[in-house]
Amino acid sequence: MRYEQPPGPGIGSTPILSVEGLRKRYGEQTVVDGLSFSVRRGQCFGLLGPNGAGKTTTLRMLLGMTMPDAGTLQLCGETIPGHAHRARMRVGVVPQFDNLDPDFTVSENLQIFGRYFGLPAATIRKRMPGLLEFARLEQKADAPVRALSGGMRRRLTVARSLINDPDVLVMDEPTTGLDPQARHLIWERLRSLLASGKTILLTTHFMEEAERLCDELCVIDNGRKIAQGKPHELITHEIGCDVVEVYGDDLPALRTLLAPLAERVEASGETLFCYARDPQPLVATLRSQTETHAMPGLRYLHRPANLEDVFLRLTGREMRD
């Protein structure tokens, strides 16, 4: 049995999740500060932000696990936190950290989780083969969870979140700690869920993940929304030009040389980021410097702007703990 649903209707016009004026304080610290956004049915919506921006706290309030200090929340037609239990029956959750039971087998983890939703044993048994196939764990059904690789455990966690056939998936950094192959497999599975009509709300630190999966993004910092839009719109609006990354032994001299040829130059560590609408003069200058060995150790990379450029422009390049 495959985990299949009728083809999804695409992205709807009615929000399945709405957040308005959400606030949360811990003592003197405001963690979420007047946050508002909505997610439409069938959409993949991404929450982006540096560490401590308020992403996980926002998810906890959406699920009724943390009480907001102000604001309104609606999830699957239910008011949160008043009817959080009813809403959660229609939601699947993929937490940031693994919370599978290592003493049980793959199948037992699915069975036990299904009971939390009050599902009949027959319903759980009917859904399990499709979920195991979805996670590519058919051959591991009777294996203990502790024997699985990190990628297998993460796929099982995603499959487990589907046991109640949810309308919405809430995913907190779903591919953290995975190697590239495992990450791409998770992305493939998430795209199939979106195609079937599921709605996904995710947080992630992987900008490529957000750019590949998300229909819309909300960037938050210090608990506030600082930008929202489709990935390509954010790239065009916030960056709007090509990027040339420059590495060399003498960054001050390189900056002096290149600044007149770029709209903007930013330094981060041992790298200069040069933003240019017409990058050819800049690239030609770098090529000349490389060919004549005028600047030892000089290397450069010319590329289109991407979502990571947007993220760093909006939130800064300083390290966050």
UniProtKB/Swiss-Prot annotation:
Major subcellular location class: membrane
GO molecular function, one term: ATP hydrolysis activity
Record carries keyword DNA-binding: no
Pfam families linked to this entry: ABC_tran
Protein localization: Cell inner membrane
Binding-site residues for ATP, renumbered to this chain: 49-56
Family assignment from sequence similarity: Belongs to the ABC transporter superfamily. Lipooligosaccharide exporter (TC 3.A.1.102) family.
Protein name: Nod factor export ATP-binding protein I
Organism: Ralstonia nicotianae (strain ATCC BAA-1114 / GMI1000)
